[in-house]
Amino acid sequence: MKKELTDLFKNSEVSEAQNFNSIKITLASPEKIKSWTYGEIKKPETINYRTFRPEKDGLFCARIFGPIKDYECLCGKYKRMKFRGIICEKCGVEVTKSNVRRERMGHINLATPVAHIWFLKSLPSRISLAVDMKLKEVERVLYFENFIVIEPGLTGLQKNQLLNEEELAKYQDEFGEESFEAGIGAEAILSILKSMDLELERKLLINTIKETKSKVNEERSIKRLKLIESFIETGQKPEWMILTVIPVIPPELRPLVPLDGGRFATSDLNDLYRRVINRNNRLKRLMDLKAPDIIVRNEKRMLQESVDALFDNGRRGRVITGTGKRPLKSLAEMLKGKQGRFRQNLLGKRVDYSGRSVIVVGPDLKLHECGLPKKMALELFKPFLYARLNKLGLASTIKQAKKLVEKETNAVWDALELIVREHPVLLNRAPTLHRLGVQAFEPKLIEGDAIELHPLCCAAFNADFDGDQMAVHVPLSLEAQLEARILMLSTNNILSPSNGKPIIVPSQDMILGLYYLSQAPFQTEKPDGYFINNDEIEHALSTGQIKVHSTIVSRFETLDEKGNKRVEKHTTTAGRFLLANLLPKHKDITFSMIDRLLPKKTVSEIIDSVFRFCGQKTTVIFCDHLKDLGFKHAFKAGISFGKDDLVIPANKGQLIEDTKKLIADYENQYSEGLITRGEKYNKVVDAWSKCTDKVAGEMMRGISATESTPDGMKINSVFMMADSGARGSAAQMKQLAGMRGLIAKPSGEIIETPIISNFKEGLTALEYFNSTHGARKGLADTALKTASSGYLTRRLCDVAQDLTISKIKCDNPGFIELAEILEGGNVVVSLSERALGRVTAFDVKNPITGEVVIKKETMIDEAGCDKIDAAGVKFIKAYSVMTCSSKLGVCATCYGRDLSRGKMVHVGEAIGMISAQSIGEPGTQLTMRTFHVGGTASVKQESQIVTKTAGTLKIINSNLLEDSKKNLIVMGRNTQLSIEDNNGVQVAVYKVAYGSKLFFQNGDKVKANEKICEWDPYTTPVIAEKSGIAGYVDLIDGVSIQETTDDATGISSKSVIDWRAQSKNTDLKPRITLRDDKGNVIKKADDNEARYYLVPDSILSVKDGQKIFAGDIIARLPKETTKTKDITGGLPRVAELFEARKAKDSAIIAENDGQVLFGKEVRGKQRISIQPDNGEPSNYLIPKGKHINFNQGEKIKKGEYLLDGQPLPHDILRILGIKDLTEYFVNQVQEVYRLQGVIINDKHIETILRQMLKKVEIKESGDSSYLPGEMIDRIKFDNTNEKLVAEGKNPASGERVLMGITKASLQTESFISAASFQETTRVLTDAAIKGKVDPLNGLKENVIVGRLVPAGTGHIKNKWNKNAIDADNKFLAEQEKIEPLETTETPAN
């Protein structure tokens, strides 16, 4: 009776299994495997081909795995529930549910041990490390090629020595068969592993590491030590890597499916298992028959191979194929890749209650609604409908309800209306690139088959109506409906999570209508009418008394400071009064907001202001009104365009002629040898790109002018479309009516001859041919980039998925310094923009008066930003995700504002995912949109600095020289010019290139728009610092210097060639020295000799023996020709930054202050050392031919670039620290996105960077168990050190390491998350050996094990659970104190 009762509560076991908070993975011992299984499989048969019943003891045996039909044994003796749990004495099958066939396992007892291929072949090979042999040697033993000495005895053989058959026979003859023990195959390896004394090995290895001098030995010993220690710590035995029992997975997971025509489709695993069983049985038979050794050995090898194929087919040897040469899918393949178990079934599941259809626009919907076709709703809400019909008494059973619904009577539709009301549904458009790709709407039943979507939601879904489809999902439970309504309803997602700007913004027709309405083409002196309110205006418009653009006087109602009603009188156009009528009443919302032209950007700003001042509800209503007004007036205006609206500028021909003359001039200079071919190319490209811009400018000027016509003013339609931001851009119009300009070859180089025609004039055949390049490149790029952008997003999501907001404030947060970002002297991002939404770490003070503008610990909002701008603050110290000291996740104070809500972030928000999506989403957008500008090249070379504002010029790090013409030449490598206003506040900073000409002295007053300095953008000069006679040294004709005569011009110039091509010349150092009249080398100001080393490709500007003056150019090094800038450069650049890859030509950063000294050459590289005033010099090897920024003996500061290029982020972290790294990294990523006009908040990039800095590399192990060079999680490292310090021991020391996102994802604490990302086999083998425990902290691992994610609702639930457990433990502890324990036994923990 008791048994049956327990059977009734069978499910209680399941809940036990679900209540866990971490998962551990270890090796399975043979005993463990046997404990899982329900019996041994002895036969390879599957099912009987006549009866279709499973064979006894076969792969589908019902006795082992359970019955085929619910509660029915195989022979049919026991049927029905009442015999539950009985085992039939005839067929041996337990009477139970048939779904146990999905969970019961079997096993195969192997006749001989077999090595597990993952631990053998997955690098580093764990088996070969454990036995301390090479992988090749272990393989030769396992696959029966060589014998191995297991126990040498007194023979003088080495332990683990390999012997072939002849050697074995020879030694056995020599020493006798019993004197030593040798073996072959997995048995031999098994006995070696069994005989290992782990503790002894550990001691020996520690000694070896201390004593060894060889780096290789040390590394291998450390690897072995780690392996041995993980065995000791986890209590696993190394011999478990060799299998003696193989588990067989449940039959329902590898089914046999009958097909039509009596054939069967089978899972590949069945084939693989059959192979193993066949060979195993044959081996048993051969051993019983005492067959010759050679036959048995061959059979053992075949068994090993078949087990290998079962676990990981194709990992070793040839792939085992099934029918039609198709490789069989092994167990490993079931797990890995996009189609594997992790990504296909655990992270992405199919859902019910969903449908999909084409979308059409629903202009009359409210923002929170979507149109749902009746048919779809009927199908989706069927269960609810049955329940409702039942409740209404229209149907008493489900069957009746079903019939009723099939008839589709009116009662059914009425009931459906009631159910659907206020039951939100989720709409999703693929690809879902960010969280706004899934939003909740209230369905509104419509006729037809298409889903209606609100036009303002298109931007969030990136949807258009050219055939896009969307999926509908129904949230079923009350909790799901609640979350959908509160968190996901489209009206709750007005702001974009990536930048905090509104994403619900009118576009296209709506913008065009609003723009047209806000036009004021002619302001008349005398108004056309006086009106009291909007009703009167609308009446006058409808009767035709006034037009939309007539100037009128009317009243505008608003609120004053105290919130009382205030009426203002304004004079403007009727259209603007219509717009003003939509504005909500609020003291901060003024008439001037709307009394201007309204292109898209301005409309976005207005919506933003309304949201900040009036809240969400008002904004939603306002947006809906804007939409209606926009559509209405776009339709009323009737804007369209014909070909005459594309006006080609009259002076286009003249501009092109001028440019052609300029280019002829360059050709002459080139033919006279004044400039090289590369320089000519650069100048020509420059000239044409300037010409194109001029033509485009003229065209825009022509189009933007309004013309008077008898019936009012005519505004150019095309201009309106582009200027308003409704459709098209200046770049596209330039191609339609200006000139197409320069285009790039597929390689990225720019073709010198531009396309002079535009599309309206039509292209010539040659121009058309040239432009086909751009068109095709665009399409090819799009296809390729979409994939790579999606992959970038996936990697970002994977690295950041476990980062959430864990508490309000951490204990001792650090801070970062924010300043405005300058590019070429222009402020690109103001300080207030960067500071918005951050929490201040110190008081922000006015730099002039010193008064506190914003107190510390305050979140900077829009009002705070205005204060910062007004006070002219230059720096702010604010908290950042990068410097947060929380152990798990990040605290809300360091994160700041939740951009999508405009308020402080909530605890439990999944900020990692939001950041990953914010960075990944525009990547895809941009890549999908590369081809819009048709490969037209846009080139802008900076060659001068023109001031933006007036002020006083200050030269920072001044190092100047006057040349013979009295020009000031900049000789400093990091000279900067700054402009200061009258208060001495810096208003602009410019970096100046070496060799620039300065037109002003330090302290001079400069006006706005004055040229203060210029340089040649195409070459880097080498400049003489003293006057003297130039002398060539090691510049030998034909070896290190050659005279090139240009074919076209016949002019010759001398350039340095690579002299190292021949080995005999490697010690040459081509240079130019300056000597005085007596032939002595002149000393420079810093007491070094005036020598100038030259690199290959330098063009000499002086002759041997020529007299030169200080400031003259000795040689020029041409810079690379310009390539087009496109996100194509951008996306790989972003990926390169996040992967922390080494760039091809990376910069070299000085590690300390000191003097630059040139040393001897080492293997064709120039050795340079920096000698500090005291201490060891730091040495660098620089490939020859690279241009070094410093000359012999010059002083260099820490962090300066010795060699130009992209610096390595690792170097910045090591030399300058985390704050500098953050600044550099954020700016580099932002530069790429800024170029595309995409705004992303800095904190998203910082969030990812935080995840890349999770690990610490151990330098000194102190008293910890860490080994030098080991990578340890930062939190673990800190915890260990805290413990050690508390115990009075030496803590370990280490330094932060920057890891690429892929590597960081694979190195997370969670092996489940890492395994589902990439390299599944490697991650799992590694985790099993280490006995890793997954604490289930991230989102991904929780999705995989099927629990609530620990963010949002899940975070709160976890918190409650923890509080409950703590309370229980406290209560139990108190109870124990009260009740004295009667037993004397110690309780087991």
Curated annotation (Swiss-Prot):
GO biological process: DNA-templated transcription
Catalytic activity: RNA(n) + a ribonucleoside 5'-triphosphate = RNA(n+1) + diphosphate
Primary enzyme class: transferase
Pfam families the UniProt entry points to: RNA_pol_Rpb1_1 (PF04997), RNA_pol_Rpb1_2 (PF00623), RNA_pol_Rpb1_3 (PF04983), RNA_pol_Rpb1_4 (PF05000), RNA_pol_Rpb1_5 (PF04998)
Its EC number(s): 2.7.7.6
Positions that bind Zn(2+) 1: 73, 75, 88, 91
GO molecular function terms listed in the Swiss-Prot or TrEMBL record: DNA binding; DNA-directed RNA polymerase activity; magnesium ion binding; zinc ion binding
Cofactor binding, note field: Binds 1 Mg(2+) ion per subunit.
Superkingdom to which the source organism belongs: Bacteria
Membrane-spanning residues: none
Cellular component GO terms, alphabetical: DNA-directed RNA polymerase complex
Residue numbers binding Zn(2+) 2: 810, 884, 891, 894
Record has Cell cycle as a keyword: no
Residue sites binding Mg(2+) per the record: 464, 466, 468
Family matches, as PANTHER family: DNA-DIRECTED RNA POLYMERASE, DNA-DIRECTED RNA POLYMERASE SUBUNIT BETA
Family per similarity comment: Belongs to the RNA polymerase beta' chain family.
Assembly and interaction partners: The RNAP catalytic core consists of 2 alpha, 1 beta, 1 beta' and 1 omega subunit. When a sigma factor is associated with the core the holoenzyme is formed, which can initiate transcription.
Summary of the function given for this chain in its UniProt record: DNA-dependent RNA polymerase catalyzes the transcription of DNA into RNA using the four ribonucleoside triphosphates as substrates.
Name the UniProt record assigns to this protein: DNA-directed RNA polymerase subunit beta'
Species in which this protein is naturally found: Pelagibacter ubique (strain HTCC1062)
Classification lineage: Bacteria, Pseudomonadati, Pseudomonadota, Alphaproteobacteria, Candidatus Pelagibacterales
Gene expressing this chain: rpoC
